[in-house]
Design a protein with these regions (language model features):
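A glycine-rich dinucleotide-binding beta-alpha-beta segment and adjacent secondary-structure elements
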Residues: 211-275
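Single conserved hydrophobic/aromatic residue that forms the stacking wall/gate
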Residues: 1-10
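C-terminal segments that line or cap access tunnels to active or ligand-binding sites in enzymes
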Residues: 118-226
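Active-site-proximal substrate-binding core of FAD-dependent oxidoreductases
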Residues: 47, 53, 294-305
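Flexible, glycine/charged-enriched surface loops at secondary-structure junctions
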Residues: 41, 45, 215-224, 299-303
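A conserved FAD-binding loop/helix module that cradles the flavin
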Residues: 271-293
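Mid-domain catalytic core of redox enzymes
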Residues: 19, 49-163
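Helical element adjacent to the flavin cofactor pocket in flavoenzyme catalytic cores
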Residues: 11-58
Length: 305
């Protein structure tokens, strides 16, 4: 099953880099609409600070350290390590399981450079560009950390003008180790040295791109950057990891995390469990839902939708 899921993800990537005109926020907005249409509630600015356990059953969650929400089931899509830190002490989740989850290594994070382009100054590219410094396409912490050796360039589609790029996103790997000086800081409180670090990294990235014959310099109106710290603080992802827990195709069971937990009404989902990325998250959510609804029932329901 794992190999089949990976083949689906690879096929999806090879077939094309599809974009949402005017951004992917539309997907989140539509999901919110569907949830509300079915009687659900979506809460903003509501951080789960505790998963309440009593008599070895999850009773609900605590929001922002104050408000309690009772529930029959809890599904967590944050990193399993983060989920375990939120759990009340219980006899069902064994120390050996906690130690294994905590020992699993995460993938690298992403440094992202957003270029706001001058109006009608740079053509829209209906494809992604992948640039590599050499024939070795794999980014390695031991040999590549701190260096720009590869990146992806993606122009964002806009309904206002389909011929020119308004925003260009440039992504390059970055481990959180590079940001050790600011590990214990919060957004907007990291100081001038952090801003200088990001500016230097952006310059390095633009120079790397220029060495491949692409020069954005005269077309840039403004620049914005994010680091793995941004992803860590806004999404709760351990180490600001881009793809969650590392999966070894030679030994997949090492990084395997089940959607079920030893607490009967606590379930896990998200890219840390099976396959990473948008398609992986979708597949994993189906597996998690199947635990509640029944896999055969859900498969037929999807098949006849």
């Amino acid at each position: 099953p794992i190999r089949r899921q990976r083949q689906m993800c690879i096929r999806d990537s090879i077939q094309g880099a599809y974009r949402f005109v005017d951004g992917s926020m539309q997907v989140a907005s539509e999901m919110i609409n569907v949830i509300r249409a079915n009687g659900g509630t979506v809460l903003n600015n509501s951080e789960v600070t505790r998963i309440i356990v009593d008599n070895n059953q999850v009773q609900g969650v605590e929001i922002n350290g104050t408000e309690r929400i009772d529930s029959k089931y809890v599904i967590s899509n944050v990193h399993p390590k983060q989920t375990l830190t939120l759990l009340d002490k219980n006899r069902s989740i064994k120390n050996a399981y906690i130690s294994r989850i905590n020992s699993l290594e995460n993938t690298y994070g992403i440094f992202t450079l957003y270029l706001v382009m001058k109006e009608k100054s740079y053509p829209y590219l209906n494809q992604n560009l992948y640039l590599h410094g050499d024939n070795d396409v794999w980014y390695d912490k031991k040999t590549n950390m701190g260096c720009t050796t590869n990146c992806m360039i993606s122009t964002q589609a806009s309904s206002r003008n389909s011929d020119y790029a308004e925003v260009i996103s440039i992504l390059t790997p970055m481990y959180i180790d590079e940001l050790s000086a600011w590990l214990h800081t919060l957004p907007e409180q990291r100081g001038e040295e952090y801003k200088a670090f990001k500016k230097e990294k952006a310059t390095q990235l633009l120079e790397f791109i220029k060495s491949h014959g692409i020069d954005f310099t005269d077309h840039i109106e403004a620049m914005y950057t994010t680091t793995p710290l941004s992803y860590r603080d806004f999404t709760g992802t351990c180490d600001g990891s881009a793809y969650g827990i590392i999966k070894d195709y030679k030994c997949p069971q090492v990084g395997f995390v089940s959607t079920r937990t030893k607490l009967g009404n606590l379930f896990l989902t998200g890219q840390n469990l099976n396959v990473h990325g948008a398609l992986g998250v979708t597949l994993t959510s189906i597996i998690t839902c199947g635990e509640l609804l029944g896999h055969e029932y859900l498969a037929k329901k999807i098949g006849h939708a």
